[in-house]
Amino acid sequence: MSDSTIRTYSSDQRQTDNDETVSTPDEDVLTCPECGGQVIDDEEHGESVCVDCGLVVEENGIDRGPEWRAFNSTEKDEKSRVGAPTTNMMHDKGLSTNIGWQDKDAYGNSLSSNQRQKMQRLRKWNERFRTRNSKERNLKQALGEIERMASALGLPKEVRETASVIYRRALSEDLLPGRSIEGVATAALYASARQLSTPRSIDEVANVSRIDEMEFKRTYRYIVRELSLEVAPADPAQYVPRFASDLDLPDEVERRSRELISNAQADGVTSGKSPVGLAAAAIYASSLLTNHKVTQSEVSEVTDVSEVTIRNRYQELLEATEAAA
């Protein structure tokens, strides 16, 4: 008797649920306030329109879909801007997970000794799974080296990203055999800074690198040639803002320095000259011309250019300016 009652109730309940399920869509259908007809959404025009009388019930509707079109799944994945952010500065592009170094649980409580040992083992295995082969270990080491040098040189994120892409290209085209990881990473960072008009001198990059300057120059020429990188000659004017800022000089000095360099370029004086030396001499000359005097030794210390070079380029800049006048 009891079982029969239960079965009967369950059957009635299922029938009631089915009735509710069937009736739910009818409640969601919009009806026209004028004629009671069905209202449809015209997504192309952003309007809700009655199919019977043509009344526009709503207009300027919000299009909640993407503004781009994709014709296959590959295009959809490439154009989509949702999901976890990716970056070329990590060997796995930031798609894997990390186990935090803090030995605390979700509530901020310290872990016991056994739990700490367990987490240490998990971190070790997690790191091994993230770098499963020698190629990934190579990439991880190189990208870490790029990040270290870029941080020491004060280079922005865009330069680091581009340097990472250059290194990945060198790795994929098998350009590393016979060359050190540090050498290719240094060359990639220097080329990236040149491409994005945030140059650093060869001496500056060599000072933060773990390789000697000769290997750095040789590897840089090789990478640029093999990857067909478009690297324009360094413009001395690109160094001026940084040097002027380091010397705490006003905008007037920076503006005058650019004029001196422009005159020298028009006169052909800059050909074959170090851009850093020309920028240092322009800063020194413009500071004297605008009565914001700095000594040659101060400019030399900031720019890492010898005082002899500053004096020689200084004379050439003044001669070019006089010729332009």
From Swiss-Prot:
Q: Which GO terms describe its biological process?
A: DNA-templated transcription initiation; transcription preinitiation complex assembly
> Is Zinc among the key words of this record?
yes
**sequence repeat copies, ranges:** 144-227, 238-319
Which keywords fit this entry according to its UniProt record? Metal-binding, Repeat, Transcription, Transcription regulation, Zinc, Zinc-finger
Q: Where are the zinc fingers (TFIIB-type)?
A: 28-58
Q: Which InterPro entries match?
A: Cyclin-like_dom (IPR013763), Cyclin-like_sf (IPR036915), TFIIB (IPR000812), TFIIB_arc (IPR023484), TFIIB_CS (IPR023486), TFIIB_cyclin (IPR013150), Znf_TFIIB (IPR013137)
Keyword DNA repair annotated: no
A GO CC annotation given for this chain: transcription preinitiation complex
Q: Where does Zn(2+) bind?
A: C32, C35, C50, C53
Region annotation (Disordered) ranges: 1-29, 73-93
Q: Enumerate the Gene3D superfamilies for this protein.
A: 1.10.472.170, Cyclin-like
Bias kind Polar residues: ranges: 1-13
CDD domains in alphabetical order: CYCLIN_TFIIB_archaea_like_rpt1 (cd20549), CYCLIN_TFIIB_archaea_like_rpt2 (cd20550)
**Listed Pfam families:** TFIIB, Zn_Ribbon_TF
For this protein, what is any one GO molecular function term? zinc ion binding
Taxonomically, which superkingdom? Archaea
This molecule's function is given as: Stabilizes TBP binding to an archaeal box-A promoter. Also responsible for recruiting RNA polymerase II to the pre-initiation complex (DNA-TBP-TFIIB).
Identify its protein family: Belongs to the TFIIB family.
Q: What name goes with this protein? A: Transcription initiation factor IIB 2
Native organism is Halobacterium salinarum (strain ATCC 700922 / JCM 11081 / NRC-1)
What's the encoding gene here?
tfbB
